Amino acid sequence: MSPKTETKASVGFKAGVKEYKLTYYTPEYETKDTDTLAALRVTPQPGVPPEEAG
């Protein structure tokens, strides 16, 4: 009989979805010479807030 092991899912990883607007802006980011600036027009689907669509 093999020994039983216990798995702790909360160690190192927490399942779930973060709200997008909490992760899309990084104020401490510093631009680099290799960064590319792009402008895109995004039209959200019905029921999606504009800031979530971009």
From Swiss-Prot:
The keyword Plastid applies. It is found in: Plastid, Chloroplast. It catalyses: 2 (2R)-3-phosphoglycerate + 2 H(+) = D-ribulose 1,5-bisphosphate + CO2 + H2O; D-ribulose 1,5-bisphosphate + O2 = 2-phosphoglycolate + (2R)-3-phosphoglycerate + 2 H(+). One of its GO terms (biological process) is photorespiration. The keyword Lyase applies. SUPFAM superfamilies: RuBisCO, large subunit, small (N-terminal) domain. GO terms for cellular component: chloroplast. InterPro entries: RuBisCO (IPR033966), RuBisCO_lsu_N_sf (IPR036422). Residues 1-2 form a propeptide. It is an enzyme of class 4 (lyase). It comes from the Eukaryota. Its main location: plastid. The modification N-acetylproline is found at P3. GO terms for molecular function: monooxygenase activity; ribulose-bisphosphate carboxylase activity. Keywords: Acetylation, Calvin cycle, Carbon dioxide fixation, Chloroplast, Lyase, Methylation, Monooxygenase, Oxidoreductase, Photorespiration, Photosynthesis, Plastid. Disulfide bonds: none annotated. Its EC number is 4.1.1.39. Heterohexadecamer of 8 large chains and 8 small chains. Belongs to the RuBisCO large chain family. Type I subfamily. RuBisCO catalyzes two reactions: the carboxylation of D-ribulose 1,5-bisphosphate, the primary event in carbon dioxide fixation, as well as the oxidative fragmentation of the pentose substrate in the photorespiration process. Both reactions occur simultaneously and in competition at the same active site. The basic functional RuBisCO is composed of a large chain homodimer in a 'head-to-tail' conformation. In form I RuBisCO this homodimer is arranged in a barrel-like tetramer with the small subunits forming a tetrameric 'cap' on each end of the 'barrel'. This is Ribulose bisphosphate carboxylase large chain. It comes from Magnolia liliiflora (Mulan magnolia).
